[in-house]
A protein has these predicted regions:
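N-terminal intrinsically disordered, low-complexity, charged/polar
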Residues: 1-11, 126-137
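Short alpha-helical interface patches
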Residues: 19-26, 82, 100-104
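Charged/polar, solvent-exposed surface patches and flexible loops
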Residues: 23-28, 39, 61, 72, ...
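Winged helix-turn-helix DNA-binding recognition segment
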Residues: 33, 44-101
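Short, amphipathic alpha-helical interaction segments positioned at domain boundaries
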Residues: 100-130
């Protein structure tokens, strides 16, 4: 493609958002810190909608946030179904393609199915932890 906006552009990394996702995000109660962390994660998204997690201290140094704030923001992003732990990769988060996606748009359904599987496992584990805590009290 040649034209005004394509001259000399090489290997641009990008992600897209959906209008549905943007509308849902506007209705959340995410904090400024949550959004800051989200955009940090999006700046590191790969074509599979994954983000390899650096340790919280390094992330904190990059975006000027404490480890505690990062942990809270990750919990908030999970609670709002924006991210989930990738069940196939260690130290990796998966971004919900309903909100943001990278790579081929033709794989959105496949990515959404995988996110749903990851998120279900997160909910199942959360439920087990709640049940275990009730049983120990």
């Amino acid at each position: 493609m040649a034209g005004k906006f394509y001259k000399g552009l090489k290997n641009i990394n990008w992600y897209a958002t959906t209008t549905e996702g943007a509308k849902e995000l506007s209705k959340t109660f995410l904090t400024g810190s949550d959004f800051r962390l989200l955009f940090y994660l999006l700046s590191n998204i790969n074509d599979d909608n994954q983000v390899k997690l650096n340790n919280y201290e390094n992330i904190g140094n990059e975006i000027n946030m404490t480890k505690t704030t990062i942990k809270k923001s990750i919990m908030n992003l999970k609670a709002n179904e924006i991210i989930a732990k990738d069940i196939d990769e260690v130290k990796t988060l998966f971004i919900n393609p309903k909100f943001f996606y990278a790579g081929n748009h033709k794989q959105i359904e496949e990515k959404q199915s995988f996110f749903d599987k990851c998120y279900k496992e997160y909910l199942d584990n959360k439920s087990k932890m709640t049940t275990n805590n009730k049983n120990t009290n």
